[in-house]
C-alpha cells in the first residue's frame, strides 16, 4: 500500500512540473510592454496551486501515517469515539481552508492584492460596488467570480474570515472532548 501511495505522490510531483510549465507558458503568449507586465492566467495559477496543495496534503498524510500510526486499541472507547467525532467536525473547516487558499490563487493571478491593499475596508468601501453588481446578476456575471479584481479580493477576505471562525469552532469542540494528548495538541494548534 505504501509503495502505491508513494508512486502516486511521485506522479503528482511530476505532473506538477508540467502544470507549472503550462502556467508559465500562459504568461509568455503575449509580450510584455511598459504598461502591461508579464502575467499568468489566474486559472492556470490556481490549478498549479491546487496541485501543490494536493501534493503537500498527500505527502503530509503519508508521513503522519508512517511516523505516528493511530492505534485505537490503546485508548478508551470514549476517547476513540471523540477522536473520530473531532475528525469529522474538522472536515468542513479543512475544506473552507483549502477553498480560501485556492481563492488566493485568483487574487494573485488578478493582482488584486495590489489594487485593494487596505484593511478592513477595501479602499473606501466595506463592499465595493462591483461586488454588489456581480452578485445581483450572477448568471450574466459569473466570470467575475474569478476575473474581477474587487470580487476575487472580497471573496478571498470573506473566505478567510470563515476559515478563522471554523478554526475557532474546532478549537471549542476539542476543548470539551476527552482526547489523547497528541490529538488535543494537534487540534489546539
Model-predicted regions and their roles:
Residues 1-189:
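Polytopic transmembrane helical bundles with strong interfacial aromatic enrichment
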Amino acid at each position: 500500500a505504501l509503495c502505491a501511495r508513494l508512486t502516486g505522490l511521485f506522479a503528482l510531483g511530476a505532473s506538477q512540473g508540467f502544470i507549472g510549465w503550462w502556467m508559465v507558458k500562459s504568461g509568455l503568449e503575449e509580450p510584455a510592454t511598459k504598461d502591461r507586465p508579464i502575467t499568468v492566467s489566474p486559472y492556470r495559477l490556481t490549478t498549479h496551486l491546487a496541485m501543490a496543495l494536493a501534493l503537500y496534503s498527500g505527502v503530509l498524510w503519508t508521513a503522519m501515517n508512517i511516523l505516528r500510526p493511530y492505534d485505537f486499541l490503546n485508548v478508551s472507547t470514549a476517547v476513540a469515539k471523540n477522536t473520530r467525532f473531532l475528525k469529522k467536525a474538522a472536515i468542513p473547516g479543512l475544506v473552507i481552508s483549502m477553498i480560501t487558499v485556492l481563492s488566493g490563487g485568483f487574487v494573485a493571478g488578478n493582482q488584486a492584492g495590489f489594487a485593494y491593499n487596505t484593511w478592513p475596508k477595501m479602499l473606501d468601501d466595506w463592499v465595493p460596488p462591483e461586488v454588489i453588481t456581480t452578485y445581483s446578476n450572477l448568471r450574466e456575471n459569473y466570470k467575475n467570480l474569478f476575473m474581477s479584481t474587487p470580487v476575487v479580493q472580497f471573496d478571498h477576505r470573506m473566505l478567510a474570515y470563515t476559515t478563522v471562525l471554523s478554526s475557532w469552532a474546532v478549537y471549542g469542540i476539542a476543548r470539551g472532548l476527552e482526547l489523547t494528548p497528541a490529538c488535543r495538541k494537534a487540534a489546539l494548534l
